[in-house]
Regions:
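An anion-engaging/catalytic patch
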Residues: 1-100
Length: 100
């Protein structure tokens, strides 16, 4: 696991050698883009956003979102949603995320 930095925000990332792409923690990306103060707030924001995407019929996008164990702030390995750059761009191109 690597840590990437975007506007002074830490984003957990993992290189998937099978698909030869970086996968990023969706919660970390959401937190960075929405300037959430805590990981809990970013997690809540992502949960609401996932529900909106499901309501819009974007289930196929979420189906491709997988979970990996990544090091959490408390030092434990916890499952978190991860997505490639392409998947992230699709999530945030949806109408429900335009006010992002």
């Amino acid at each position: 696991m690597k840590i990437k930095v975007f506007q002074d925000k830490r984003i957990r990332a993992h290189w998937d050698s099978d698909i030869e792409e970086w996968e990023f923690s969706v919660v970390d990306v959401v937190g960075a883009l929405t300037d959430q103060k805590t990981l809990r707030a970013a997690s809540t924001y992502w949960a609401v956003l996932k529900n909106r995407l499901k309501e819009e019929g974007a289930d196929e996008l979420l189906t491709n979102c997988k979970q990996l164990k990544m090091l959490a702030a408390d030092g434990k390995m916890r499952l978190t949603d991860v997505a490639t750059t392409k998947q992230l761009l699709r999530y945030f191109a949806q109408p429900s995320t335009r006010n992002f």
